[in-house]
């Protein structure tokens, strides 16, 4: 009979694991409910971690019951009443503190990283408009601003905005050789943020976007953005003509029990970002869904043909 370590190696022998060996749980899960996990060897473990996902615990009955009901599944090319219901549900949950949802439109995708990738695609469209020969910032070099320790996903453009992972990318990826488009400033240093935008004017840069987490998820887990820094980012991006994304995927509902940063204490009177992403707070860890919420300006920037998604409703 195999011991547990041998069992682990056997069941994962056919896979490449993304993560460090010491990050792999030292058991094989056989069954689970709520915070309890039963292992293949018969141990019963209390697991409240859930990797940021399992707020409802393992195999949540209410969620699984809802998913088991017959659904008319259609992507965005086929109008469906489920789309109207979801739109209304989102608008009900965003803007509790300000009399209504400040976002004009929603775009539905699968993974969280995909929604950030679409936000970056919209920012890319804006960058072309701004830096084309007839643009406001014609011919300028494109830069991007994040805070040190930021995390926005591991797919192509979200990875570029993720300072917490950058060391590994620079070490192993040819595409990062000489890559210097990202300005990472000390977390929540308003003066440093203002200086970055001042440098953009003197050095001929166009700042494509500022990407910001309400609560850091990787670099300094749990550290939250102060309203003053958010307000500065909102004003500076607007004045410069760039876009401001708040990536609320890692924050979920855990920060203040609300979906959007616009309802956080201290943020009620501040203008909404151009774009905001959600995922883990929406999909109950059971259904691959993420959402990019956009204001009128960002919605108007989207161009048909620059993106597509098959599976989301």
Where are these regions (language model features)?
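Conserved N-terminal phosphate-binding loop of PLP-dependent enzymes in the Aspartate aminotransferase
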Residues: 1-313
